[in-house]
Regions:
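Signature for HUH/AEP ssDNA processing cores
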Residues: 2-124
Length: 124
């Protein structure tokens, strides 16, 4: 990993700090798509489970993949699309996202930024 990649990862981790024990990956199947937790599992063992009528949802031998620098690097170079889980296990969060999409979205966004500034809350 070069210095630029390292700096990208550290910037991402500082802006989008969330759970580190799990992250989401994007999936596509037919005309549907979405995000699901990234898991580590033995595909051969799972295939046997599936052949016996099991599903991935009730497959007991899967564990979450941790959000590592390597997983972030794969995201940055386009190998995978990931999402973070911002809600921590203690029901707190390090960041929030605000969506302004009505007629007066610019004014609302400026008001939001001003309110954050008044409360010393970093906003970008």
């Amino acid at each position: 990993m070069n210095d630029n990649s390292f700096n990208q990862i550290k910037l991402f981790q500082s802006l989008f700090k969330g759970r580190e024990d799990v992250f989401a990956v994007r999936w596509e199947k037919s005309s549907k798509s979405g995000y699901m937790p990234a898991y580590n599992y033995d595909m051969y063992h799972y295939r046997a489970h599936k052949m016996n009528g099991g599903t991935f949802q009730n497959y007991p031998h899967k564990t979450y993949l941790s959000l590592t620098d390597n997983e972030l690097q794969k995201h940055f170079i386009g190998i995978q699309q990931i999402g973070v889980y911002p809600l921590l296990q203690d029901n707190t969060s390090w960041f929030l996202v605000a969506d302004f999409d009505k007629q007066n979205w610019k004014e609302e966004a400026v008001n939001f930024l001003n309110a954050c500034k008044e409360e010393n809350i970093p906003a970008y």
